Amino acid sequence: MDIKYKLASYRICSPEETFEKIQEALKKIETVEIKNIQHLDKVNIPVYYLKRRVVVDGKEGIAIHYGKGANDIQAKVSACMEAIERFSASYDKNKVKEKPDNPINVEDLILPQYADKNVKEWVEGIDIINNETIDVPADAVFYPTSGKLFRGNTNGLASGNNLDEAILHATLEIIERDAWSLADLARKIPTKINPEDAKNPLIHELIEKYEKAGVKIILKDLTSEFEIPVVAAISDDLSKNPLMLCVGVGCHLHPEIAILRALTEVAQSRASQLHGFRRDAKLREEFTSKIPYERLKRIHRKWFEFEGEINIADMPNNARYDLKKDLKFIKDKLSEFGFDKLIYVDLNKVGVDAVRVIIPKMEVYTIDRDRLSRRAFERVKKLYY
């Protein structure tokens, strides 16, 4: 299906249409409140949060989800879709089976040393590279999980206006985290991106908002061997508040969409930190409050330093504006470099397409320091040295 909305995002319909479609789903996930929190930060870039009721271990509680965007409606829909995909990823006993028919090699999931490899619960997925069903551990699908195989995470969870859109965006997130992990392992990240030649006016608009607020943005190129742009946006705040030393990373076939995602991710990181509701924000505040701003910058200096510069026009752009063609390009690239499976599990629970995508052998070090493959350092060497 053709991509129709491509200025602020890359979707088959506008965020206004999406918001209208998901109203029933928002009721089903027990949405309590959807609110704009951009007023908490000086950069004036839209960030929303969605609050919903949850039951954990028989006790009622609240879950918070954040959304980002270059405009108000996009940020609002982003928060809603994240909430829907998280609800959809909750444990579903109807999908679980004890005996796999075609089990994945669990070692390909890059396991921590503490992993219990005696997997007792499996879920059937579809491998769209080899066009076959394949069984994956339940811990790799649902969130939250038992954590016996590895710590639960949301990497590769996505929702969309249709199944292919959800698969595409989940896949791009996995490629993003893989590239980010390799950058984390590298001693230097040498290439800065010059955004002056950006054709998308929203890029200039967002950077101008940061500059007016006294926040310098540095864009770094993290693109790996797949030639799918991965961009990091690093914020250097003149207020020198350690909490505002944030990084946002975006990945997309179109470099300008990758840049937009990175820029809006920084805004979301800042606003959610100031909102301070979630446990991860509180832990980060506790940690960073003990370290002076300039020292934090020195610790993370590879993100600020650079040796060369490229223009956006120099970056690969393989966006086909067609979901099937986009996915085919990605599948071909993955296969070319030895990543021979792209698996998705359909998680649709509330009438909105949601998936968990799993790409075996992809790095997740940036979100789980206990999981690192031997191959990672070879890839870092080729990319950065």
UniProtKB/Swiss-Prot annotation:
Classification via InterPro entries: Methan_mark_1, YcaO-like_dom
Pfam families for this protein: YcaO
Domain of life: Archaea
Chain ranges of the YcaO domain: 67-385
Coiled coil regions, renumbered to chain: none
Name the record gives this protein: Uncharacterized protein MJ1094
Organism: Methanocaldococcus jannaschii (strain ATCC 43067 / DSM 2661 / JAL-1 / JCM 10045 / NBRC 100440) (Methanococcus jannaschii)
